Amino acid sequence: DLVIGIEVPSVEKTNELMKQCDRVLATGGAAMVEAAYSSGTPALGVGVGNAVITVDETADLDDAADKILMSKTLDLAASCSSDNAVIRVDAIHDEMLAKLQQRGGLVLDADQKAKLQQAIWVDGAINAKVVAQTPAFIADYAGFDIPEGTRFFIVPETGTGPDHPF
């Protein structure tokens, strides 16, 4: 099953479910994320407004790209459930990237990425001035130009942890 619902949820049932599945995507508070990491199952822990999407070789790539576009552009991605990060497995990496670009995704270069990072995170917190804004506004605010028709940014990341906020 892709999604399993628990009719009467409890901490015990949630912990047991996390031990039995193939992968956990844990959202919510720090305790839930820590429980996922401790379950023995590969886990992604995310905070508020940081939904992670995984696309692998079994996915309908056009459908996945359409849904990512919708999530990134509906209400300017202001919802906490908007896709924030996309993990693409190696087998479909290039093809999926091309499909996202065909839908208006712009792959940022290292200079644009650095400027965007400075614009988004100020003193370790999200800068409210760039929340729920258009790509054109954000790029202008950050100090770089983008082609007309850019609908969302694709920011290649090279690592994880506090030094890699994307």
For each feature predicted by the language model, list its residue ranges.
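PLP-dependent aminotransferase-like
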Residues: 1-7
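Residues that line or immediately flank small-molecule/substrate-binding pockets and catalytic motifs
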Residues: 7, 28, 90
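Short acidic active-site motifs
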Residues: 10-13
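Structural alpha-helical scaffold elements that stabilize or flank donor/cofactor-binding regions
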Residues: 16-17
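An anion/phosphate-binding loop that grips the pyrophosphate of nucleotide cofactors and donors
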Residues: 21
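Glycine-rich phosphate-binding loop
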Residues: 24-36
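ALDH superfamily catalytic-core signature
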Residues: 33-162
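Conserved glycine-rich beta-strand-loop-beta hairpin in the small C-terminal domain of fold type I
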Residues: 166
